[in-house]
Amino acid sequence: MRYDPEKHHRRSLRLKGYDYSRPGAYFVTMCLQGREPFLEIPEVCHIVEDIWKALPQRFPTIELDEFIVMPDHIHFILHLHPDHTHRPTLSTIVGAYKSLTARAVLSHLRTRGDICGNQFWQERFYDHIICNETELFAIRSYIHKNPLNPGLL
């Protein structure tokens, strides 16, 4: 099948014209492929959390903030700090995180005998540029309350 830009074009979820390597705070949601609840498995949850905690070793210009694991998705807040020599974009950071976690989790699930295909995360992710402290506190509150109200997403 040939590529048809009219048929195969996916609308970008990123804000048009925005430089996602700019310093600032970002709220990100990533969902599992098919919304499968693999994150309910304690070992899988630990893998996802451990790789999250190690992310600043790979990207020294980031600061981790809130992070929550739900059965079929995760939320986190990430801060990008200014650095004139190394400015990864939000997509680069999220892509690396998705790749590292998918490889580790799929390997673990295969050793357990759980079949989940070759894709762990949905291809895209959702982001929100956090504009001020009030918004940051509101999103932190949302993340803290999400396990109490899993139907919020």
At which residue positions do the language-model features occur?
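Short catalytic/metal-binding and nucleic-acid-binding patches
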Residues: M1-L153
